[in-house]
Structures are given as C-alpha cells and as structure tokens.
C-alpha cells in the first residue's frame, strides 16, 4: 500500500490526487513493501529557494527528489522520501517542448519516484536504464516517448 501525502502549496491548477496516486503506484509497483511518499507542489519562488539550497542552482527546476535516509525498520511504514514539483516549470516545459501537459506531469512524477528507488542518470548506462523504464511506464499510460525529440 502507498501512503501518499500530497501537499498543494501553490494555488496553480495541478492534476488530481487520483492521478498522482496512479503515477506513483505505477512507478513504485516493483516495490512490494508498503511505502510512504510526500509530493509537495510549489510555486516558482519556493522551487527556486529549494533548488538553490540543495543543489546550489539559482532557478526553479521541474522536480526535486529527496530520498529518505531512515532505516525501514525504524518506521511503521517505510518512508521513500519527498518529491517537490514546481507547477510553473512543468507547465512552461510542456509548452516549450510541445508536450501534452498531462503526459509531462506523468513523466516527471514517474521520474522522481524512480530517483527515490535509487535510479539515476549521472552516467550514460544509468541514464539508459532509467529512461527505458520511464518509456515503458509512460507507454502503459498511453503517453508518447518523452525522449523522442532528444534523439533526433
């Protein structure tokens, strides 16, 4: 079972709680243990502040992943971590990249969840593995390959 804490810290419209749950459960289905996850939806100011604090980048980014660092045995429900998603950046990227907004949301939530599971894209081999899984999961939702334009 997934315990999802969805925090809407921005007044901007965003997908429904049910959609976030669907995307998270899809990305996390390989994990058999119960899990707890927080997603915080923020405005650009908070997104920029968090990105500056944690990554030393002075701009808001689409999604930040904060894996939990607490041993599972110390918790009633294992804590995967937190995702922080900047609504304005998601909307802007979708428009600039010509992507359907819902597909971009799904991609970023899945991408963030995979980071919480330990996937990364620092080197090419890791990136290929992570992107292949993202493509597969998004295809199950009927969404196009989010990296198709990157390869042309």
Curated annotation (Swiss-Prot):
Subcellular localization:
Cytoplasm
Q: Which UniProt keywords apply?
A: Cytoplasm, Endonuclease, Hydrolase, Metal-binding, Nuclease, Ribosome biogenesis, rRNA processing, Zinc
Give yes or no: UniProt keyword Transmembrane. Answer: no
| E.C. designation(s) | 3.1.-.-
Task: Report the GO molecular function annotations.
Answer: metalloendopeptidase activity; RNA endonuclease activity; zinc ion binding
Q: Which InterPro entries match?
A: MetalPrtase_cat_dom_sf_prd, YbeY, YbeY_CS
One GO BP annotation here? rRNA processing
Residues annotated as binding Zn(2+) are 111, 115, 121
Q: Which cofactor does it need?
A: Zn(2+)
| Cofactor: how bound | Binds 1 zinc ion.
Task: Give yes or no: UniProt keyword Nuclease.
Answer: yes
Listed GO CC annotations: cytoplasm
According to its UniProt record, which protein family does this protein belong to?
Belongs to the endoribonuclease YbeY family.
What role does it play? Single strand-specific metallo-endoribonuclease involved in late-stage 70S ribosome quality control and in maturation of the 3' terminus of the 16S rRNA.
HAMAP family noted in UniProt: Endoribonucl_YbeY
Q: What is this protein called?
A: Endoribonuclease YbeY
Q: Which organism was this protein described from?
A: Pseudomonas fluorescens (strain ATCC BAA-477 / NRRL B-23932 / Pf-5)
């Amino acid at each position: 079972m997934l315990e999802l804490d969805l925090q809407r810290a921005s007044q901007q419209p965003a997908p429904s709680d049910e959609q976030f749950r669907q995307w998270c459960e899809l990305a996390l289905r390989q994990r058999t243990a119960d899990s707890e996850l927080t997603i915080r939806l923020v405005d650009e100011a908070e997104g920029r502040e968090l990105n500056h604090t944690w990554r030393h980048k002075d701009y808001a980014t689409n999604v930040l992943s904060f894996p939990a660092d607490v041993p599972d045995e110390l918790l009633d429900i294992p804590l995967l971590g937190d995702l922080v998603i900047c609504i304005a950046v998601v909307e802007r990227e979708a428009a600039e990249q010509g992507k359907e907004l819902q597909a971009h949301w799904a991609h970023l939530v899945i991408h963030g969840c995979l980071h919480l599971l330990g996937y990364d894209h620092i080197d090419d081999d890791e990136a290929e593995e992570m992107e292949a899984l993202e493509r597969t999961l998004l295809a199950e939702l009927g969404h196009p390959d989010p990296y198709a334009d990157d390869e042309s």
